Amino acid sequence: NFVKFSKGEIWSKRVEMLKAVGLSGEYTGLYPRQLSGGELQRICILRALMAEPEILILDESLSGLDIFTENKLLNYLSDIKVKKHLSIIFISHSIESAYYIADGITVMDKGRIIEEIDDISLFSELCHPFTSRLMHGLPISASATQDYNFYLERFKKGDTRLVTVKPGHRIEL
């Protein structure tokens, strides 16, 4: 997809994108071994965006970043998503980050969908015990553990299905 850009356009685009995520243009000449983990993560995301994809898949791409860098990158991705009509599949254990960038959320546990919302405005209504654990990041209480174990046993037996709670919100029962 880079064929449509001249070398000069690629260079200026690269520098512009680096600045947008808090890196200077001098990073264009550095080798990966000269970069920190967070710098590498940002550059990998920018590299994927250089090709102007229609869909971007980010799998735990913000893990290990400090909160300021994470916020800067989320702001950039949110802006790019709107400006370029980019679809982002954002895989993360940070439900807060997903909330910030998502139009809808699908929560999975052990490879199965346990809850999903089509509209981020329904975020506060997420209610599955596993989702609650993700949202609050707190130690699990005895009652929450019992609820979770109940769902886990049903899951193991294959006795689960997604039920529509209200339009745009489905939960495993």
Annotate each predicted stretch with a short phrase.
Residues S92-H93:
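H-loop/switch region of ABC-family ATPase nucleotide-binding domains
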Residues I45, L73:
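Hydrophobic anchor residue at the start of the ABC signature
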Residues Y31-L35, E39:
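Conserved ABC ATPase signature
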Residues A98-Y100:
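A short, surface-exposed alpha-helical micro-motif characterized by mixed small hydrophobic
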Residues E9-E26:
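Conserved ABC ATPase "signature" region
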Residues D119-L173:
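Short catalytic/signature loops enriched in Gly
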